[in-house]
């Protein structure tokens, strides 16, 4: 896949997770909901500051992140693979390994 996000944008591939109900029943499809975790595939150069400088992003390629799946997150298909394009500010946390 050849895609380069601009500025503070990040390309994330959603990680599918198995969901279980409180009773231990495995939920699939729409009942399970969409995961808000993903792997960072590409990052932009950084956020442009008011003084013209650039602040590097905190996330790196390969990081597993938890993100806010809402307004501002763009879903695209690239090479038949669904990816999310979001600002770094839409990322809530980096999952430490």
Curated annotation (Swiss-Prot):
Gene Ontology terms: biological process: chaperone cofactor-dependent protein refolding
A GO cellular component entry from the record: cytoplasm
UniProt-listed SUPFAM superfamilies: GroES-like (SSF50129)
Keywords on record: Chaperone, Cytoplasm
CDD domains named in the record: cpn10
GO MF entries: ATP binding; metal ion binding; protein folding chaperone; protein-folding chaperone binding; unfolded protein binding
Compartments reported by the entry: Cytoplasm
Domain of life where this protein originates: Bacteria
Disulphide-bonded residues: none
Similarity field: Belongs to the GroES chaperonin family.
Record's function text: Together with the chaperonin GroEL, plays an essential role in assisting protein folding. The GroEL-GroES system forms a nano-cage that allows encapsulation of the non-native substrate proteins and provides a physical environment optimized to promote and accelerate protein folding. GroES binds to the apical surface of the GroEL ring, thereby capping the opening of the GroEL channel.
Subunit structure: Heptamer of 7 subunits arranged in a ring. Interacts with the chaperonin GroEL.
Name by which UniProt lists this protein: Co-chaperonin GroES
Species annotation: Blochmanniella pennsylvanica (strain BPEN)
